[in-house]
Amino acid sequence: MSTIEATHGWLQSTLSADQTQRRAAEEALKQSEFAAEHVVHLFRIAADTSVAVDVALRQAAAIRMKTVISRGWDSADGKAALSAADKAAVRDNLVEAMVVAVPVVRTQLGLCLRSIAQIDYPGNWPGLLPAICANMQQQNTERVYGALFALRMLVKVYEFRKEAERAPLHAAVEQTWPLMAQLVEMLIATPSVEGAELALLAMKVFWSATQISLPPLLLRPEQLAVLLLAENRTPTPTLTLTLP
């Protein structure tokens, strides 16, 4: 049975210069992929601030977690390898983890969110959008950034979907667009490098949401104009970060 201590040790050994030790750790992690609570242990090591580990180990845990989710969330025969309890634990805490994670970990958690949303959203993940919206309204820049990043990962699920499959995207736009427009207006009023990065990420959400067609809300000229006009008035930062 996998424990968080054992998982921590295996991950640490995968970073070892000793090839034999690395291979043994990789094999142990592979054998434990779908063991009860293993994905939760990986999640905690990656994102739980009460677990004292360095960034390299958090990143390794997040990458391993992404692999486990891609292999075990929904198998080819329709039977998931991961337990319902473990999946619920990940879903219930993923957005919160993303808003507090360091960037290299947040990126991997975002890919986890995207993989899960492709299977579970919206029916089995009703709390996802409310969690994103709640964090978009916070005064903390990191929380807002994490929420926007989570939103982009969700929207990308529907980026190239047929119109008949885009109803969840339309619902997400209806709920988040007013918050996003309000956020960009606020960022313009108090320009900064961090604010420009948030505005850029908001535009990436918009880009992903409008690849195939405009969601119904954005067919209204006054709604579409809000973000576009705001972006035209956003000052270019002296430093920009590379966003996925």
Feature map (PLM): residue ranges:
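Karyopherin-beta/Importin-beta family HEAT-repeat alpha-solenoid scaffold
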Residues: M1-P244
